[in-house]
Amino acid sequence: MPSVLIVDDEANVRRMVGALLSAEGYDVRDAGDGASGAARAEEAEPDLVLLDLMIPGALDGMAVLERLRRKFPDLPVIMMSGRAGLADAVKATRLGAVNFLEKPLTPEGVLLAMASALELRIARRERTALRADLGLAGQLVGESPAMDDLRAMIAQIGRAHV
């Protein structure tokens, strides 16, 4: 089952969401501030992060989001907040958040957002793999040293028979 990191300064949120996700079979880890959340994400490389926007400390939610997006471009991050407005949701989305949940959270809302985010991650990974396959195929067929040698030999034969 996918692994999830919950980063929130409210122990109740971490406990309740963690219990919900554990019951659904997710491997759940948590952190209570931005710095430890970023560190846990970097060491554990979760499949998804639920991140509170307004966490205290040197790294707030937006700073953690930016850091995670730089290090793990395909990692889906869902932002959560009880006090943020539309401007914060737009900013988080521009920085790469895949969803923005308002507190108080509902089990249905969390599970739906997570399912969508995990599907997006799978699609991104498949796209990356397909692009790599296409690049390799182009390289093998059209740009390989063997093809360059073959083209040179054909050109040489063509000049010899003219």
What are these regions, as identified by a protein language model?
Residues G25-A35, A39-R40:
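Short hydrophobic/Thr-rich beta-strand motif most characteristic of the beta2 strand and flanking loop
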Residues A11-R29:
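Two-component/phosphorelay signaling modules centered on CheY-like receiver
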Residues R131-H161:
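AAA+ ATPase active-site-proximal loops
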Residues A39, M54, L59-D74, K91:
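Short amphipathic alpha-helix used as the core "switch/output" element in two-component signaling
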Residues D8, D52-L53, S81:
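Active-site residues of response regulator receiver
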Residues A44-L50, I55:
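Active-site beta3 strand of CheY-like receiver
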